[in-house]
């Protein structure tokens, strides 16, 4: 029996990226820098989150020409983003042959009621989450990989830390629940009880959970790995820094060797300025991308 497109295959593809760094790129040149630095995959888009935030307006799926340019430039997997709920954008990316689709809050949501039914696709999906309720709902919809939402395009790690800690704390709580407590918790979280039962049985999420949204330095990446991340997405942090090549290599090394503090200290020397960050407290509620999705 062919397993193409099954949860087993799609989750297995995501597992292969575990321990690695996935970098946002906007052209072939950046994609080659990411691959040379050791990225396990790249996310092809027209603008990094910091530029999307600055430009405002409606952010949509990237021009397929940009995505194909990146796909032709590198041998590592290529991801691309679609708007939340935009089934047709996802079908277009699947037709292009991308390796993963990110149903992303970085783009302007297309549907304020429904996320994409990811079970209908052969290509695996990655989705963001802030808590176990969001994580479980995305898994039930067919997500093969999760990531913290953080606050994209800010260079501020605080929200990614908050989301990773919250998900892991809620997992620990679920693991110790009785069946009746589990049913009540599912109702409280708005989560399918079947997914919570699987989490309880495994003692963890059934899919990998990467850190994303605010990673800007090697130390940020190492911190998220310490908190239990399975890997790291870096959006604006690399190509909005003063020295993208150095930052890319340093973040990859810090993610792999996140317990080697002497190495991280060495990696952090002479990098040049990190991307200019934003204090989350200064963002108006309507400018907080993490609030998108349900």
Curated annotation (Swiss-Prot):
InterPro entries (UniProt xref): Aldolase_TIM, PdxS/SNZ, PdxS/SNZ_N, RibuloseP-bd_barrel
Residues engaged in binding D-ribose 5-phosphate: 24, 153, 214, 235-236
Residues reported in the UniProt entry to bind D-glyceraldehyde 3-phosphate: 165
An annotated Gene Ontology molecular function: pyridoxal 5'-phosphate synthase (glutamine hydrolysing) activity
EC number(s) per entry: 4.3.3.6
Keyword Lyase among record annotations: yes
Superkingdom field: Bacteria
Pfam families linked: SOR_SNZ
Active-site annotation: 81 (schiff-base intermediate with d-ribose 5-phosphate)
Tagged with keyword Lyase: yes
Pathway field: Cofactor biosynthesis; pyridoxal 5'-phosphate biosynthesis
Keywords assigned: Lyase, Pyridoxal phosphate, Schiff base
HAMAP family (UniProt xref): PdxS
PANTHER family for the chain: PYRIDOXAL 5'-PHOSPHATE SYNTHASE SUBUNIT SNZ1-RELATED
Record's subunit section: Homohexamer and homododecamer. In the presence of PdxT, forms a dodecamer of heterodimers.
Record family assignment: Belongs to the PdxS/SNZ family.
Protein's name according to its UniProt entry: Pyridoxal 5'-phosphate synthase subunit PdxS
